[in-house]
Amino acid sequence: MIHVLKSRSTLLTASSIVRTSVGSSSRYSQTRTYSRTHSWSKDASGGAISVLPTKLPFGEQAPRFPHTLGLPLVSRPLFPGLVTSVTLTDEATIDAMEALTKNQDQAYVSCFLRKKNPTGVSEGGVILATPEVITDPSDIYHVGTFAQIQRLTRGDETAATLILLAHRRLDLEYVDKIGPPIDVTVKHWNRSDYTGADDTIRALSNEIISTIREVAQVNMLFRENLQYFPMRVDANDPFRLADFAASISASGTPEDLQAVLEEKDAEMRLHKALVLLNREREVSKLQQEISQKVEERMTEAQRKYFLTEQLKSIKKELGMERDDKDTLIEKYRKTLSEYPHVPEEAMETIDAELEKFSTLEKNSPEYNVTRSYLDWLTSVPWGVETEENFDIQKARKTLDRDHYGLDDVKDTILEFIAIGKLRGSVQGKILCLSGPPGTGKTSIAKSVADALGRQFFRFSVGGLSDVSEIKGHRRTYIGAMPGKLIQCLKATGTTNPVVLIDEIDKLGTGFRGDPASALLEVLDPGQNSTFRDYFLDVPVDISKVLFICTANELERIPGPLLDRMEVIRLSGYDLPEKVAIAEQYLVPKSMRDSGLLGVPETLKLTIDAVRSLARWYAREAGVRNLAKYIDRITRKLALQVVAESEGATLTDKSSRKSNTWEITEDNLHEYVGKPVFTSDRLYEDGPLPHGIVMGLAYTSMGGSALYIETQSIRRGLDSEGKTRGGGTLKVTGQLGDVMKESTQIASTVARARLSDIKPESNFFDINDIHMHVPEGATPKDGPSAGVTMVTSMLSLALDRPIRNDLAMTGEVSLTGKVLAVGGIKEKIMGARRAGIKCVILPAANKRDYDEIPDYLKEDLEVHYADTFDKVYEVAFSSVDST
């Protein structure tokens, strides 16, 4: 137990047992007075060494200093009679130990085991991470060892090695000073303190000696220590024997070893040491078993290798088997002989690599690299082409079988086949299918391959930012391999497949290069006949490949890349087309996938139900969501069929009858829930409010209605009754830069037009105008709402509403010209969905309107405008002034 000395000159805290005495420096002069001058010799490594005489008092003859320096130890305590080395890294501690070595009579320290290793605890901005630094006396155990400094070696300026000889145990009574190093007051143990029964001690001693010898048979460390056992430890001294046994135990934990050190009873000390030895014996046996198993496996592997090599040599002598390299070289040459035409440059490279490969040893680092290179060179189908289908009627049937509509794509493919039939050969082509999601861009590519009789390969470049995915890795890199184009030729086994490059508008860029620029060579008919992959580094002809790219937004494709493609725009499907697609493709496929084709029940999804699905649940341009809703319906039907079937089985199998389930417009909500959409129109009945006009928008999801709302706020008056300042324009609705510019142009055109219609009006001078485009969470941009904005402002300024069944689109110039816009078909489809009867289009878009199917034009009044005067005439003609 450690006592805390209380005196008038001592400061005590609850967490410390540190004693400091005023005027007591002379009492501790042997440990506190250090000198930096010392004579040193050199060891073999060049470090400075301080050596004390070897003939010094040992054990009980060693002095008993009550006040010494304290030295913390890590991992293992120091047992009496043993020698250990301690590495010091704290400069103050090294200086203190160096001072002690000056006087051999004072070269003693008290060693205590730390309870835990230092982990770099920060205190006051200083990292306390060295083992010899103690900041809290409770960090060390209070039973330690009185040790003599035998030797101190300085390796460099920051570290030193201390050799210690342990003499006896001691108790820590006080910590006089927190260092580093610490000053401690100790109480030495006496031999008279030990007790124990002679017979029991003798039995335990014999068992320890027997266990040590048993462990030494399998443990080399024990065997080496046992050689010095007779000289170092008296077998009749149970205390030294227990200390020796504990000190050579490698499996003992610091707590277990400290327990042996603290034990005063000889019998208990021997017993605890024996427990450590028994644990060491079990660990040694386990290590021996593991070592034997590993050795047996290695011996067996070596034996198999030796026999295998002998067998290979015998077979080779008898001509029964050839060397692996010879077999591979023969396989490569046989593969090359089967190709119709290998380019001269490629053949020269292959011959050179085969010659190098024949000289390489199997264990050479170059062996696998060369073999991989030859594997890829011989895997390219040099000159191999798939025989194509030139039957126009068969190709048309294949395309019509898989897809409804898409006439532009089908006609282009049929033209491609016709040219090939006339020429007798087919060159490659680069098509780009652009349109909203779910319109069949990806799936039509597979149908094109089937119609042509070609192999099909698809890879997506969405988010791709590494050029190596296109052009391969250079062979200097570990794990290098060719790019997707060469992988495509190997996978299809032909040089004229149909290759689908999906999501080309979503190419990324990064520090590994620009994939869009890498595709310029791939998609250029004038260059791709000698495409050179970084890995192969030989020209490969990919000019006969039919490339089909897909994109949602052409604006995101770089101009030079887009210029190399033949763009085919796929507009969204209108309501009749969606119903036809669902009836001919989606419903039968969903029934088949749900296992409902062979059931005795009658299942029916009415046309009205499909129409309601397309109108109120899946209004996007494609049919992907429509297919999801149909799948949801068939899954619920499958559950009902199985439930009915199991119910009939439980009652009477013979009583089961065919049931009829009919999905109609009335019970559709029971299967798919409430409608997602209600109406495209914000204002249903009657004339529109002043300042409200419906425009038409075109997005990646198709066409839709786009309202423009304008409201005026009267400006305040000054003291003379005049309006302060001029009118301002505020726009909201998350508009893009182009659309914001359109609002400024529309404001100017509206002001100019108002001055012509009503010269006396000062509406825009005395009012602030706020223009808003509803659905503010949706970003909007583009110039096609120009005429709609001008009409909205004039409706507000003239205090006249416009027709409720009118929608318009067109860009307006500063002089009032109405300019052409895109997406006419999609906008007409959006207008019909919103119930619009009258549409104003730019005159330049008349040719686009003429190409729209006739059923979309039915009951639709269309006006063409080349200037805003025509727009004004149509918009306000049938509405009386209010």
From Swiss-Prot:
It catalyses: Hydrolysis of proteins in presence of ATP. Residues 687-878 form the Lon proteolytic domain. Residues 1-34 form a transit peptide. InterPro entries: AAA+_ATPase, ATPase_AAA_core, Lon_bac/euk-typ, Lon_lid, Lon_proteolytic, Lon_Prtase, Lon_prtase_N, Lon_prtase_N_sf. One of its GO terms (molecular function) is ATP hydrolysis activity. Transmembrane segments: none annotated. GO terms for biological process: cellular response to oxidative stress; chaperone-mediated protein complex assembly; mitochondrion organization; oxidation-dependent protein catabolic process; protein quality control for misfolded or incompletely synthesized proteins. SMART domains: AAA, LON. The keyword Amino-acid biosynthesis does not apply. This is Lon protease homolog, mitochondrial. Residues 68-281 form the Lon N-terminal domain. Pfam families: AAA (PF00004), Lon_C (PF05362), Lon_lid (PF22667), LON_substr_bdg (PF02190). One of its GO terms (cellular component) is mitochondrial matrix. It comes from the Eukaryota.
